[in-house]
Amino acid sequence: MTVTKMSWRPQYRSSKFRNVYGKVANREHCFDGIPITKNVHDNHFCAVNTRFLAIVTESAGGGSFLVIPLEQTGRIEPNYPKVCGHQGNVLDIKWNPFIDNIIASCSEDTSVRIWEIPEGGLKRNMTEALLELHGHSRRVGLVEWHPTTNNILFSAGYDYKVLIWNLDVGEPVKMIDCHTDVILCMSFNTDGSLLTTTCKDKKLRVIEPRSGRVLQEANCKNHRVNRVVFLGNMKRLLTTGVSRWNTRQIALWDQEDLSMPLIEEEIDGLSGLLFPFYDADTHMLYLAGKGDGNIRYYEISTEKPYLSYLMEFRSPAPQKGLGVMPKHGLDVSACEVFRFYKLVTLKGLIEPISMIVPRRSDSYQEDIYPMTPGTEPALTPDEWLGGINRDPVLMSLKEGYKKSSKMVFKAPIKEKKSVVVNGIDLLENVPPRTENELLRMFFRQQDEIRRLKEELAQKDIRIRQLQLELKNLRNSPKNC
């Protein structure tokens, strides 16, 4: 297969999205005064749904994040209540796609936690999670909810494992153990039957998640992959990464044949990570650079040249990460097709950016709003774990988003025990993988040995004292 090297010059074609533009919200509709985390982990640190905006914050003595009702814009008070139950920095947060007041978080403290946000938002600091999930032996960098199944959560840790949690029972039910280094990104196809990952070992993988079997694997020598996203039902993957000349690059792949990318395109010479976002309804791809203020957007097609450049949104304020509003939360009366929530660390600002298709008519535009995945799960955990796949339950945006009958998350009652998956106790110490880890483990063991020796010495002294007391009692004259 030959690789098509695309020109840097934009290719114009007839498209109803060629005039899409980005509109920044007015300052009074932004969220100001937020101490956004300074953590250098390559995540968005932001999650949004139709009710709440969650942002990971800078804090001392453990990790925390804010949860703000969307209507509460403007300046946020410094003492605003936080979710602060983690003992380490929070690295990722994701809202449950089917229950809009349930959020998952993961942290450097090796745990994943599930939180239930009160109806009107937080009134005081929240320290007790609805559910604590312990199964990783090192910090947890990623969490992802299954796209069609309720209460199935995926987590990826620095122990190179992906755990699949059934939250109905509060335990890991599967473990994917095919990676040889830190997992950088996870993405599902439309029905959640396939999982694709990128890894620090420079490999791109397509995995059957229930069995953990690797279906396709690419060793990316000329394109060091960082992020990956499934392109809806096109059977295509798009990755962002770095070329051999250290320029930012994207590549398009056939998910059934990862031997060679279909196309590669160099973007620019900046060093920040490229975050890809794909809208399956409009077939539009958005590329946002970490550390710059630009968002490029393209249209994806199944025929060559596959990728057509549309336009670029430019902003002088650099972005640390971006949250994305679900489709049913968009303003269809304004022909809004995508909405970002941009984290501007230097200003402590969260800035909504609406991507709008200019139309003269105020009527509902059916051509840009097809049926879209809604808020009802298609499967139960037992059905999905039993091997059933089902497409998302679709909804129309014509009448606007109407909240369906409320689903309630019921936390299982858990007993403390060892966590065994695939015959392996996940809470046991795992062997060190690097020299630094080996040294740290060695020094910890030395400290433990020293402490145990001191305890033994104290117990020996106590034993001798008791022996002397017993001897004295035996030798003392009996009381008459």
From Swiss-Prot:
Output the GO biological process annotations, alphabetical, semicolon-separated. actin cytoskeleton organization; focal adhesion assembly; negative regulation of cell-substrate adhesion; negative regulation of establishment of protein localization; negative regulation of stress fiber assembly; positive regulation of establishment of protein localization; regulation of actin cytoskeleton organization; regulation of cellular response to stress
Highest taxon, organism lineage: Eukaryota
Name where the WD repeats lie.
29-77, 78-127, 128-170, 171-212, 213-259, 260-305, 306-345
InterPro entries, A to Z: Coronin, DUF1899, WD40/YVTN_repeat-like_dom_sf, WD40_repeat_CS, WD40_repeat_dom_sf, WD40_rpt
- Record has Cytoplasm as a keyword: yes
Expression sites (tissue/organ): Expressed predominantly in brain.
Q: Which family does it belong to?
A: Belongs to the WD repeat coronin family.
> What does the record note on quaternary structure?
Binds to F-actin and to vinculin.
> PANTHER family under this entry?
CORONIN (PTHR10856), CORONIN-2B (PTHR10856:SF17)
The protein's name is: Coronin-2B
The organism named in the record is Homo sapiens
Query: Which gene is annotated as encoding this protein in its UniProt record?
Result: CORO2B
